[in-house]
Regions:
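Compact, well-ordered interaction domains used in eukaryotic information-processing assemblies
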Residues: 9-79
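Basic DNA-binding region of bZIP-type proteins
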Residues: 81-94
């Protein structure tokens, strides 16, 4: 899961308990290779954060990892699970 816990910095915690921090300039300052990470901060609002997240899925046929990028808005203090990100990436983009 990703959770946005700080509206000023944009601190994320993944389901593996790794931390991803978005600095005030919108750049990713801390990432890990085995967890989702932020590729773009689209807009930082007072109560939500609009971002693009990159994570790796595993192909059911080949077993290989593949990158998936999806745009998601995270309300302040709320969790977003990878399962919900995956389902959103298959929906039509509006």
């Amino acid at each position: 899961m990703l959770v946005w816990t700080n509206s000023k910095q944009g601190t994320f915690t993944s389901e593996e308990k790794e931390t991803i921090v978005i600095a005030n300039n919108g750049e990713t300052t801390v990432t890990t290779s085995d967890t989702p990470f932020i590729t773009k901060v689209i807009k930082l609002y007072e109560e939500s954060l609009d971002i693009q997240v990159l994570y790796y899925g595993i192909s059911s046929t080949t077993g290989e990892k593949y990158p998936t990028e999806v745009r998601v808005v995270i309300p302040k203090g709320r969790y977003v699970s990878l399962r919900s990100l995956k389902s959103k990436s298959t929906e039509n983009n509006s």
